[in-house]
Amino acid sequence: MGNKKKLIHKGLIDKFPDNISVFVDVFAGSSIVGMNVNADIHIVNDSDSNLVKLYELFENYDVTDIINHINSRIGEYGLARERTKRNEFKDKRKIDEYKSAYMKFRADYNTNPNVLDFYTLMFYSFSQQFRFNNKGEFNMPCGNDCFSHKNEEYIKNGCEFFSKCTTKIYNNDFRELLKELLKMKCHEKMFFYFDPPYLGTTATYNENNGWSEQDETDLYSELEKLSEYNIKWAMSNVINNKGRVNQMLIDQIDANNYNVHTFDGFTYMACGKGNSNAKEVLITNY
């Protein structure tokens, strides 16, 4: 969420068209972008069913109930109420206690998983992200963050967005989503935003070859198809990551005369090694 929030402050939404009727967030992730877009209808999609469970959490639960549950678990397990970065937090013994509390909570969640505990775990996991092993167990290590007032604001915004806006939630691969949406009579009113996994980065969501060159190629084909329908779209991506250039993306931009928008002073940061100095851009067909 952090990267997109920073880009929103740097004018990401301002680069979108005015008067959007249907906003399609193809790789919604935290859905922070969609929450900041004014549209008549929001289509929120992600292929990760765990993220879709969070959208449904915001849609179906009261904000007070969510926050109360999180605070209850913090008290029950003795989770940290402040950041515990080792070079800033002086009490090393406390850090170990908080880590043990997290591991206990994680083990209990894996025994009896539920969406409220899953969401609570994320606030204390490394980089506040999630990951599951082959057994379906949450296995993200303990991080140094905690549940904060900023997190409470995000929950309030999320609940308001999913409960009060006209939203339609999908849990599809991007290829299947576009195939389905382009059959709708209102497809010409749609604006598509893509924030795919970035080829060549090592973010948690892209471990174990989660995003392949074939996926990248298929995505480019879908973008071309939308352009053929005269449908506007925008895509966030990274062209250069620590010296590794995404030549596939550059060739696609050049071949189709897409526009590339940059954000002064913004560097893409991901949970993973080797992602420093990766400049994020916005690519559009308008």
Indicate residue ranges for each PLM-predicted region:
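Long, positively charged, glycine-interspersed low-complexity recognition regions
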Residues: 199, 208-286
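Conserved proline-anchored active-site loop of SAM-dependent methyltransferases
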Residues: 10-12, 23-37, 44-48, 119-126, ...
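Class I S-adenosyl-L-methionine-dependent methyltransferase module
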Residues: 40-168
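Short, conserved active-site loop motifs that form the nucleotide-linked donor/cofactor pocket
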Residues: 166-167, 190, 258
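Short amphipathic alpha-helix with an adjacent loop that forms part of the alpha/beta core around
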Residues: 178-187
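Conserved alpha-helix/loop element of class I SAM-dependent methyltransferases that forms part
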Residues: 3-19
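Mobile active-site "lid"/loop adjacent to the S-adenosyl-L-methionine
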Residues: 134, 138-146, 198-218
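Short loop/edge segments at beta-strand edges and connector loops
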Residues: 170-172, 264
